Regions:
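Thiamine diphosphate
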Residues: 1-149
């Protein structure tokens, strides 16, 4: 995986899926992935529109890198964390797309409803997510170790 062309790939995959008789499509992206390829949201006036909900997990940077060895480096935040402060709502407005800010997990099914290309934003705390990720990894490692004993 990576961030180059992910939005454009999701749009193309959704269009292919729907051309093949499939229904709506969904893409789950991080905020940096969206920002890196936000031009993929800008479709020409003659281009078909996918029925695609793009869900953006926004932790204001590269939260996935918090679990790597370099997370303790003094320049981690500047080089890997890369906080941006960009509004996903404004990205949606520039592309003239519907936007939903999701506050509660229970509201996700409703937030995914709609037609056409649309953005759903879920804001998370990067540090809390890193702690949760570590706890889940530890629990999985312990369960696997218990299984092989």
């Amino acid at each position: 995986s990576g961030i180059d062309g992910t939005v454009s790939t999701a749009v193309g995959a959704a269009l292919a899926h729907q051309a093949d008789g499939g229904g709506e499509a969904f893409a789950l992206l991080g905020d940096l992935t969206l920002l890196h390829d936000q031009n993929g949201l800008l479709l020409g006036p003659q281009e078909p529109r996918p029925d695609l909900a793009v869900v953006v997990v926004n932790n204001d940077g590269g939260g996935i890198f918090s679990g790597l060895e370099q997370a303790g480096h003094p320049d981690f935040e500047r080089v890997f964390g890369t906080p941006h402060g960009v509004s996903v709502e404004q990205v949606a407005a520039v592309a003239d797309l519907p936007y939903t800010h999701l506050e509660w997990a229970a509201d996700l099914p409703k937030a995914l409803l709609g037609e056409g290309l649309r953005l759903v934003e879920v804001r998370t705390d990067r540090a809390a997510s890193a702690r949760l990720r570590r706890a889940l990894q530890d629990a999985v490692a312990e369960a696997v170790a218990d299984t092989v004993r």
